Structures are given as C-alpha cells and as structure tokens.
Curated annotation (Swiss-Prot):
GO biological process, one term: nucleoside catabolic process
Involved pathway(s): Amino-acid biosynthesis; L-methionine biosynthesis via salvage pathway; S-methyl-5-thio-alpha-D-ribose 1-phosphate from S-methyl-5'-thioadenosine (hydrolase route): step 1/2
Annotated gene: mtnN
One protein family per Pfam: PNP_UDP_1
Record organism: Shewanella sp. (strain MR-4)
Keywords annotated in UniProt: Amino-acid biosynthesis, Hydrolase, Methionine biosynthesis
Matches recorded under SUPFAM superfamilies: Purine and uridine phosphorylases
Keyword Hydrolase included in the entry's annotation: yes
GO annotations of cellular component type: cytosol
InterPro entries: MTA_SAH_Nsdase, Nucleoside_phosphorylase_d, Nucleoside_phosphorylase_sf
Residue stretches spanning the membrane: none
Record's catalysed reaction(s): S-adenosyl-L-homocysteine + H2O = S-(5-deoxy-D-ribos-5-yl)-L-homocysteine + adenine; S-methyl-5'-thioadenosine + H2O = 5-(methylsulfanyl)-D-ribose + adenine; 5'-deoxyadenosine + H2O = 5-deoxy-D-ribose + adenine
Name this polypeptide is given: 5'-methylthioadenosine/S-adenosylhomocysteine nucleosidase
Amino acid sequence: MKIGIIGAMEPEVAHLIAAMTNASSQTIAGIEFIAGTLAGKDVVVTRSGIGKVAASIATTLLIEKYAPDAVINTGSAGGFVDSLSIGDIVISSEVRHHDVDVTAFGYEIGQMAQQPAAFIPAPYLVEAANKAIKQLGEVKAIEGLICTGDSFICDPVRTKTMLEHFPTMAACEMEGAAIAQVCHQFGVPFVVIRSLSDNANNDSPVDFDSYIVKAGYHSALMVMLLLEQLDPNSVK
C-alpha cells in the first residue's frame, strides 16, 4: 500500500516529513516529492503550493509518477461550525467547490461543468480517520462538508453568502476540491483532513498567522494516526 499525502504549505507537511524514514526526494516542475516510510506505510509527501491550480498540478504528478493507492490532503482550514475551536479537525464527508457558478447551464452552485456536484471520499479512509479520532485526546474531530475556493475567506458578508449556498459547510480551504477532482478523474481514492487555523471572520488573517503551525501539527498527527489504522487489504 502506497499513500500520497499533499499539503499546500511547509507547516502542513513539516511534521510528516520529519517523522519519515528511508526518505528520498525528487523535484518535478518545481514541486518536491519525498518518498519514504511513515507509520509503517509507504508514502509520498509533497508540498503543492497554495490554490486549486497548484494543487491540481501536484496531484496529477503524484498520481502519474508514483501511482499511490490513495491520496490524503492535509492542512489547515477556516471553520464554520460553532462547536469546533481552532486546532480541531474536520474529516471530509464530501468536498465541493464554493467559487464555481455555471448554474446558467443547469448545474448546482459549486458544481463544475461535466463534474459531480460533490466529491465523496473513500469510505475506508473515512473509517480509518474515525478510528484515529479516538486517539486524538483533547482535539475534537467531526465529519463534514469541506468547500474549496481560490480565496482566503475573512469577510463576514462573503461567509454569509457561502453558508446560504452551502448551509452544512463545516470548513473552507483552497485545495481540497481540486485534489478531489483530480483523484476522481484518475479513479484514486481520497480523503481530506483539515485542522482549523481560523474561523473565517475578520480576525482570520491574524488567527491564521498565529495558529497555522498548531493546525498543521494537529492535521499531521491525525494523518499519522489514520495511516496506522489502514489495513493494506482494505484498498478499494
């Protein structure tokens, strides 16, 4: 079993890379891919860069060059659930674009033309994540809708509009749906694991800078615990 792990920023992958053994590195199109062992599994970890285009490029290269059995997207997100605090975790129940609108042609808001409205993670990866939750201690984790767009959300007016479009949204970020869409195209199972760095409000820029390291650590810890729960025979 080989697992691809994608984070956008250095704090989102640093703890994973530090915990790897037998690591080797290759750079393709300016993106570093580090192959090795983590939590007893063969993994390839990469820092994609921020945003949907960067994430799509990294995911495509990862799948084409390394042929992972599954892909995990890790990192930070803005939170939309009152019961969650900064540092808590959202596991994707589904992933959608929040900044796509081709409704004029009969598609749902957030649905890219010729694509599903929502990208659904592999049940066995979500199951492994839920098992890992029990080992997180004081960190709270839930399953929920994660939405993606090429904007850092810190405007209450925009937050209100997003919640009108996606009332069950638990978190938003800038890469997950792009990674999910590429995985969908290639038929590769995926899951998105995000730790909250802010609450998508006026304080978000300050909160993000203050808490990105904490969010990156919690998300990385969750990924490592998830890897420990994975049964090589469960890949499907």
